[in-house]
């Protein structure tokens, strides 16, 4: 069925979406996510209701439900925006920092950029990721979002490992599948980041340095080519 409406004179009348209206809707959606994240982190996922989130965001509960049909949808988008580093439909692996990282001249620079990008991602998203993991068992929608998220992460790690393989940089005897598993285990664990930064007073830069060293030790050939 067409979305184009007809005016009184029979001429087609298209939905009106001014830049100001689109921007206002985007800002309202951002305000809802910010309010939800604040309450989730302060009070926990389970005790936080959609009504309280709406009140915190300064919108009607119906408005919140029109944007996000459930708490799980809200948390999933909070995580997605944090992981991607911004709004929009482009996945992480199609955004400029990732593309530029894979195109870096030397393997050492590729690994350093990957580690630094991972630290920045964890700084933005680790707490929301941890919250999703902690509550997935009791929320079927979160379970689904968790499975999708893990699949996306593994796909990104596979792309990274494949890029290293194509440049002759994987350690001897290491194939793309095993390299992907190692990267998935050591680079996509928000608990490790939070333990180091919260309990050991590490900075994100120190975490990036650790990831750099681990990848270099476990995944990269001793003298990789720069091809």
Predicted segments with their positions:
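Helix-turn-helix
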Residues: 31, 35-77
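Hydrophobic/aromatic-rich alpha-helical bundle segments in the mid-to-C-terminal region
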Residues: 3, 165-214, 222-227
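Hydrophobic alpha-helical connector segments
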Residues: 71-73, 77, 88-123, 180
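Ligand-binding pocket scaffold of soluble enzyme catalytic domains
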Residues: 4, 51-52, 63, 67, ...
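N-terminal intrinsically disordered/low-complexity leader segments
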Residues: 1-27, 223-227
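Amphipathic, non-transmembrane alpha-helical scaffold segments
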Residues: 25, 29, 79, 111, ...
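Amphipathic alpha-helical packing segments from all-alpha helical-bundle domains
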Residues: 116-133, 140-167, 177-178, 220
């Amino acid at each position: 069925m067409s979305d184009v409406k007809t005016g009184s004179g029979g001429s087609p009348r298209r939905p009106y979406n001014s830049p100001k209206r689109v921007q206002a809707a985007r800002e309202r959606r951002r305000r809802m996510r910010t309010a939800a994240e604040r309450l989730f982190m302060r009070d926990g996922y389970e005790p936080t209701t959609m009504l309280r989130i709406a009140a915190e965001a300064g919108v009607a509960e119906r408005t919140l439900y029109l944007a996000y049909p459930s708490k799980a949808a809200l948390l999933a988008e909070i995580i997605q925006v944090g992981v991607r580093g911004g709004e929009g439909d482009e996945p992480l692996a199609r955004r400029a920092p990732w593309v530029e990282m894979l195109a870096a001249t030397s393997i050492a620079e590729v690994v350093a950029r990957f580690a630094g990008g991972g630290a920045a991602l964890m700084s933005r998203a680790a707490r929301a990721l941890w919250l999703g993991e902690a509550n997935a068992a009791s929320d079927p929608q979160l379970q689904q979002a968790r499975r999708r998220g893990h699949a996306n992460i593994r796909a990104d790690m596979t792309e990274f490992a494949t890029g290293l393989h194509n440049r002759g940089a994987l350690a001897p005897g290491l194939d793309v599948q095993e390299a992907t598993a190692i990267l998935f285990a050591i680079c996509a664990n928000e608990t490790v980041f939070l333990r180091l930064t919260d309990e050991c007073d590490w900075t994100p830069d120190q975490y990036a340095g650790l990831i750099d060293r681990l990848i270099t030790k476990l995944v990269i050939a001793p003298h990789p080519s720069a091809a």
